Amino acid sequence: MAKLKKALITGSAVGIGRAITLDLASRGFDVAIHYRSSEEEAVKTCREALKFGAEAFTLQADVTNPQEARKLVEKAAQGLGGLSVVVNNVGNYLETITSQVSVEEWQEIIDSNLNATFYVTQAALPHLRKAKWGRIINLGFASAQNVLARKNITPYVIAKTGIIIYTKSLAKEIIEENITANVVSPGVVENSIDLNNFIPKLPSKRPASFPELTNAVWFFVNPDACYITGQVLEVSGGWNL
């Protein structure tokens, strides 16, 4: 089992990030809970994590800013006494006709998804190397896995596709250091926008539950998964079939 069980999860105040945080806390991990503006929700998540006997605390940062992302990682590592797992969950979503996307909207989606993942991961790598083992799990998107065009969400798909390529490239470079990097790609999740529109189109006819996603994250975090890296695990109920 891991010698160091210390995890930073970005965007972990609510939704998928919250579920991942509580799952890791239930498995004996100390957790740093990141939020940008949802302080009240982050505190609630922290209280729930503490019930598992984990060490837990909240940290505020805008990880689209590289300096803030670096400070977040440093504070997380200092507060936890090290860092071995990073889950990059943060990322905004935009649904707009491609030809009508503004420059500002484009930049926001790329920054909050692809760039934030890069900033946090780059800052975390020295700490994972110090721990002598590490797990990097980045959240993708089912459509991005096969580079499928999806109407009205072009910037989001491009950002998530970039995350997949970045993760694969990084994985190849760091595997000899006992650090793996993988992607979990959800499709429609129980808290997704416009569920009624998406569900009839899914072979499963239902969204993914949070436990189904957290189990996928744990699959990669698990120390027994040390020989699995650069992979994308789609949790989509057959989205791409």
Q: What positions do the PLM features span?
A:
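Conserved glycine-rich cofactor-binding loop
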Residues: 13-14
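The beta1-alpha1 cofactor-binding region of Rossmann-like NAD(H)/NADP(H)-dependent oxidoreductases
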Residues: 39, 60-72, 103, 211
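C-terminal substrate-recognition "lid" of short-chain dehydrogenase/reductases
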Residues: 80, 209-240
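Substrate-binding pocket helix/loop in short-chain dehydrogenase/reductase
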Residues: 97-98, 102-110, 198
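Active-site helix of classical SDR
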Residues: 121, 159, 167
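Alpha-helical segment proximal to the catalytic Tyr-Lys
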Residues: 126, 172-173, 226
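Short, small/polar-rich loop/turn modules that mediate ligand/substrate recognition or access, typified
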Residues: 175, 180, 228-230
